[in-house]
Amino acid sequence: MEGIKVLAKQFGKIKTPQGLAVAIALITAIAWFPDGLAGFLPSLKSNPFQAIIGAILTILGLSIIFFLHKKLRRGQKDSIIAEFGFIVLTLIFSLIVFNDFAITQFITSSLVFFSAWLHVREMEIVDYTVREVRPSNVKATVIFLSSAKYDEKFKKLMEKVEEIPTINDFFDFLEKEKMRLPWEMQLRLINEFSRSLKYVYVIGSVNSSSGSFEQIEDFKLIVNKFFPQIEVIKYREGLDFENLEKNFGVLKEIYSELKTKGLKEREIIIDTTGGQKIQSIAGALYSTAYDRFFAYVSTNSKSVKVFDVVPTE
């Protein structure tokens, strides 16, 4: 099923007549090969001479395709055109020489599959460009919460929160008191999109004695104080922040949940500032799909940067 989804997506990338012709040839080959093979095998008994000629022609054709691919190739397009032209000539020749259409199907589909395999194995499968964007309607952000150090300064800060009127005053207080709060950058991200933001989905860690899962309520208290219109959603369990596969799976689960709330993928941002480097990797990887974004808040300039990872041809 996953393979069918990938194949279907590729048809949206066909932009040239040559590409369409190749796609049609491949689809035809997929349909022809089972019928051709089913007809070719019995002919080994009923008409062995014709079957042997067909087999020789197939082997010769595969050799010529390989030669065209390696020797006449100044670029991928040149190679595809030459190979495609040879396959068409072979198809016409087979139709003229053989009375058995199954042999023609077998020969032609074999050549198409071999040509496709030669090109696919040399393709640069993953190639991306990254561009900075400015989404206008961000409704949710997914945050991997960093662990805060529960010391006297932190206790003093939490006691002060209710007395501080605005989020900007809160940032000023941190600077004045020279306090390093690991949640500051994530709060700046929330502040950046607070006009449209509806949900902050928070994931905590349990991979150390100072995991952030138990600290989510304190983070929620700060968010509720300065952004009462935003709903903070706590992921049901703490994660091992060093387990990339688990982190990736949770992002997929959270996106599905947010979409049930009516959000579109382009309205969700993954924060890659918090947590560990594993979370940055997971967030960046997951955002490579169309219409997904990830954000990073600079610890130097404290500016919010949002990136769109775009697959290129």
UniProtKB/Swiss-Prot annotation:
Membrane-crossing segments per the record: 19-41, 51-68, 81-103
Record's subcellular location: Cell membrane
Topology in membrane: Multi-pass membrane protein
Keyword entries, A-Z: Cell membrane, Membrane, Transmembrane, Transmembrane helix
An annotated GO cellular component: plasma membrane
Protein name: Uncharacterized protein aq_376
Organism this protein belongs to: Aquifex aeolicus (strain VF5)
Lineage: Bacteria, Pseudomonadati, Aquificota, Aquificia, Aquificales
